[in-house]
Amino acid sequence: KYIGGPSVADKYIRSLGIQQFSILITEDDMHQDLSACYLNWSTPLEAARLLEILLTRSLFKDEYQEFLKNIMIECETGKDRLPQPLLKTDAVIGHKTGISDLNAKGQFIGTNDIGFVLLPNGSRYTVAVFIKDSNESMETNAKIIASISEVIYKYFTESYN
């Protein structure tokens, strides 16, 4: 509502070259009708691409881009997800978690985490892990995301060192 509604957000993100996603409704709409949650979606790859654009293009004033990066680095939620395997490393992670309500089948509609990792060697990667319609517990979903994060971290640290 602050930028003109879902259609304005959708159009702007498409103007950046991101295509495999949809923003049709607001967060409030989704909380009022859980089945509507499926109207807003993105592939993990497109979400990671959008984050990469945010990190590398001048979309806003520098101070606002730095603010967004720092807010992600300071994120306190979901430390058992993407950040978990990085906690005892020198890597810096910025991330944003997402969690949904349960659907009519009692499944978590979505458990997500998207972020960027700054490695000690100066390289960076972006990552997005989305779990949809999960019958697993929140703890198990977090472990799944953490294990994927660990595989990616090992790939980058072992491939580039």
PLM regions with names:
Residues 1-59:
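Mid-domain, small-residue-enriched loop/turn segments at the edges of structured enzyme/sensor domains
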